[in-house]
Amino acid sequence: MWSLLLLAALVGQGFALKNVFDMRIQCPHSVKFGETSVSGYTELPPLSLQEAEQLVPESSCNMDNHQSLSTINKLTKVIWRKKANQESANQNSFELMESEVSFKGLCMLKHRMVEESYRNRRSVICYDLACNSTFCKPTVYMIVPIHACNMMKSCLIGLGPYRVQVVYERTYCTTGILTEGKCFVPDKAVVSALKRGMYAIASIETICFFIHQKGNTYKIVTAITSAMGSKCNNTDTKVQGYYICIIGGNSAPVYAPAGEDFRAMEVFSGIITSPHGEDHDLPGEEIATYQISGQIEAKIPHTVSSKNLKLTAFAGIPSYSSTSILTASEDGRFIFSPGLFPNLNQSVCDNNALPLIWRGLIDLTGYYEAVHPCNVFCVLSGPGASCEAFSEGGIFNITSPMCLVSKQNRFRAAEQQISFVCQRVDMDIIVYCNGQKKTILTKTLVIGQCIYTITSLFSLLPGVAHSIAIELCVPGFHGWATAALLITFCFGWVLIPACTLAILLVLKFFANILHTSNQENRFKAILRKIKEEFEKTKGSMVCEICKYECETLKELKAHNLSCVQGECPYCFTHCEPTETAIQAHYKVCQATHRFREDLKKTVTPQNIGPGCYRTLNLFRYKSRCYILTMWTLLLIIESILWAASAAEIPLVPLWTDNAHGVGSVPMHTDLELDFSLPSSSRYTYKRHLTNPVNDQQSVSLHIEIESQGIGADVHHLGHWYDARLNLKTSFHCYGACTKYQYPWHTAKCHFEKDYEYENSWACNPPDCPGVGTGCTACGLYLDQLKPVGTAFKIISVRYSRKVCVQFGEEYLCKTIDMNDCFVTRHAKICIIGTVSKFSQGDTLLFLGPMEGGGIIFKHWCTSTCHFGDPGDVMGPKDKPFICPEFPGQFRKKCNFATTPVCEYDGNIISGYKKVLATIDSFQSFNTSNIHFTDERIEWRDPDGMLRDHINIVISKDIDFENLAENPCKVGLQAANIEGAWGSGVGFTLTCQVSLTECPTFLTSIRACDMAICYGAESVTLSRGQNTVKITGKGGHSGSSFKCCHGKECSLTGLQASAPHLDKVNGISELENEKVYDDGAPECGITCWFKKSGEWVMGIINGNWVVLIVLCVLLLFSLILLSILCPVRKHKKS
């Protein structure tokens, strides 16, 4: 074992790519009763015949291989060769050589070996060989107790130059066999096969090993003779033994033949009718050529005197097992026949054999494991969310458009769990699991992160910090309003004067700028008037020497005195008395504004008179009266804003925030509603219809329309199969085409085109001297059949909704279809039309459990199907297997001295593979609450892809006198509450509702606090006690949720938990799809104050320490105010 591990670690990458192969063993995630074993196999590339005879399997698995497989087994080797003398070549120009050969580890299982390996926790590892005269293709088989699935994930098997990596894969099946994406549990009872209508039928791959054992109960040839109705003698002296089989790679041993086990009967029938079983072709060997040399008889063993086995010699790629056991002797004479097809046809009595290993499909009755709904929850993890999905049975499919769904599975008894990571929580997480759409509202996760952060910052008082955090972390404006309210209450006495001072400083800054600007503008106006007046009376103000325009008379006189003397009139600096020199000096002179400033001091007052700036300076922002007034006013305004913003979070698709009560409609005219409703949505309409003449007279109206149900009458077409198409050329030099039987003749679907007596020198191999004597057989057949889905053809489809109306004390219900109406004395409810994607004649294909939805095919062949069409290979229930037609043309390709080769120009890709390649072009649909038989399928659409056009008319002709009083009495009591207020997930309130005075009453029960209602549930009450669960979203920490009916509520309410960091469960889409409309009034100012008061009382009654802490903080702010802003002392006069 260790040598193998070391070798696997040291081999190069090229060796690993070429010589390491996978064997995948599928394990259910629960160990069932009985000696259950799991099995697997893998095909290996060819090696020489001499190497094949030296093979010995090795294993690094922690379950040791059964010891009996290490013993040497002897077989009779039969091989053919051409005769040395070919001068007179004919159809008998070849001969056989028999000899004894020894193998170690060949699949020659002993009696009770599999059972002992189960009890001793040992594995059975062996191999089989498919050989021609020069090379062999090994196939490795492994049988291991099911406990290995829990003990290891992988191990390594060595066989010659090859390494096989055994990988244990957990399926989502509890104990069943995975087929068609569903978990099938076969039933061995014969009665289930007789009553097939009560059971499902599935095609399961089976592996069988022949075990030679003498005894009267093991006379297998007698059973074969009886099954085929042949009259063979001396069956008691022929081979004895039985086949031990593992069904679907996961079952307890099945022994064939066994009359009391239907599984054994099917296996035995398959071995007799198709003794070669599945071929051993590797990928790329679907197209191959055989050259048949002819039939010959051999002596088994070689020491006997007479020939007792007929074989067919061939040359080409080996496709079928070369091991068998002779039927003519009870001593167990095993055969190894490379390059020879042994005669396995049991319709003749002599010269035949039985296959040592058989692999093929059998049809079994049984049942499919139930698909359980998924539970999905998420918790915050770093910047994203860590989620987990689990289901009671198994998870057959889980996807998410916004998460990285891993393959990490955990199993606890029958429960499967899958963990995955979502990188973003800024949007809701959508997960599709077991055909259900789950929505995880991540807003609650963000709330939890906020609470966690605030609580961590103030960890000295965790209880108080948490109580404050749950108020601050409510999303939206309400959280900010809460923060503003708490800050104002605690620190308002410090923040109000501080903020006022900051505002005053800003205002004074702008006032000062405005004041200065006004003074400058007035001074400029004075200068302009002085200049205009001087120019009118005395002339120009421009200096004659420097040409500078002066602003005052005093400045002009200074220019006239200084400029002449070559001095600057401002700074008295000497400069040349020229215009250019003086103008250049003015640009650098610092005193040019001297005369302007002197005049400004004369005309502008120095002190600022009373005005805005002075008023701001005199404002008493430290006044205790001002602070108290502002503090009180801010608390009132913020409380109103807080209460108004504490709205519920709307239910999808519609729930409006409303107060207690029900809306009323005066019946002046007929009441008509016309709308479109998605197929997944329920609709509730509730109103009080009032007499337009007398408002005191009213009748309650309650209409409930359930979600759309889809019912289709179908024809069960059966199971659709994927398959591989093989094209084999078989050439023999002598004889008619009917002379030989080829192994593919026993395949379920095959077709052959023969070119008989057409060979010539231009179309012959060099060792075939005959001309016009032989046959070229072109054989098409399907192998590797695998069921992939179940198909149903729609005969008719019906869309319906259940409609219930409570009009006063009258209660009526009816299920209406498309273009149908429900008419009562006062109401008419019609489905005018339905927008749908289903139509008569469509085919529904389910590629897995029907709970996961399916694909719609508009064109599905049901007769004259060609290979490659949708529905090409079908296995109908209780009918023979349906094979496709092969419409392509054959061509025999010939070359001189070359074996002819068949060519086929038709399609070679199966219909299933074509559909997978273009699957996005087909319409798909999801299902929920699906119920099905072979004749009918009923389900609901969880995605709302279909829509109904609904029209409701309520007549205005109502007898208000007799219908105004409703005798039904409803009593309410809040029993339990789960969930959290103010979160995205919401809460669920359980109400005990009693009904008296009438037998049945359709109404709605709502979840409300003192002010508003957050959710409602339409329910049909029966006389006595009823339990009603209401889902709501919203509220605050002081909300006491009560059960309400109209304006009447239960006496006591229950408080929901605070939103926190716990896991957030996914919400099923169907549970959330309801439209509720009762016309209740919206929340007004009175309602807002009720909410504020309820919140304050909730804090006082809840965690009163929080109120103490807030008051301490208020006292601290008052002390801080007295220190920073002391009261001014007034002196006594």
Curated annotation (Swiss-Prot):
Residues 1-17 form the signal peptide. Residues 609-632 form the ITAM domain. Coiled coil: none annotated. A zinc finger (CCHC-type) spans 543-563, 568-589. GO terms for cellular component: host cell endoplasmic reticulum membrane; host cell Golgi membrane; host cell mitochondrion; host cell surface; membrane; virion membrane. This is Envelopment polyprotein. InterPro entries: Envelope_glycoprot_Hantavirus, Gc_C_bunya, Gn-B_hanta, Hanta_Gc_N, Hanta_Gn-H, ITAM_motif_hantavir-typ. The lineage of its organism: Viruses, Riboviria, Orthornavirae, Negarnaviricota, Polyploviricotina. Residues 505-626, 1126-1133 are cytoplasmic. Disulfide bonds join 27-149, 61-155, 107-126, 131-136, 173-183, 208-245, 232-349, 374-433, 378-387, 403-422, 450-473, 733-768, 737-775, 749-883, 763-894, 778-902, 804-813, 821-830, 861-865, 968-998, 991-1043, 1008-1013, 1044-1049, 1083-1087. A motif (YxxL) lies at residues 613-616.
